């Protein structure tokens, strides 16, 4: 049962052109598994699942090398093409769902602190089905990145999309939480907007975000804006309400203008324009 230390953990890592960090990430995450197994908190056959999202570099070759060197602890999934971070992460979670009891998703750049995975597992053992990794501060981000990220969460909030502030996709999910998530038929995936809808007991762990160990950020402004659009269009009726409201106001103003023009015409005060043509 839960808390017995027999639960099998799968650490799901979406990868897109991560050849510079993959070996470092694998070593760090294997260290986490070894530590948790040694402490009796997870099953001995717990593993890391790297999801190759159509990388153009040597990412997949390195995943294969890691699997050959560590066949129990490292596995890989190769997607047919580049489907994007959210779909790659979803593919990894659904693959891991049948192979594990609990999952932790984390990006390959290791900016999220792997040390708090133990705290996530402890909260899982205490009954939580979803544990969010939340950044305390964004000191390592550039001013531009920090400002756009804060703007992202503010827009989400204004549009009525429920998200956990300063949480990206570093989270623990129990098997039943992943099963519940897999039932959603969303085409515009925005996982951090979907998680609060699942229900079940949730909690947070807090950590300081680090700088990338190597390589470049895979979330430039363009992708961030696309993610925001997906979140708003998938989880908020506010844009529809706003468009509907604007439409109603325009119709009312048009009717009032037509009535005014007609009255002016009938009383002889011709408004220059179309009423003089009647």
Give names to the regions the model predicted:
Residues 31, 35, 65, 69, ...:
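Conserved amphipathic alpha-helical interaction elements at protein-protein interfaces in regulatory
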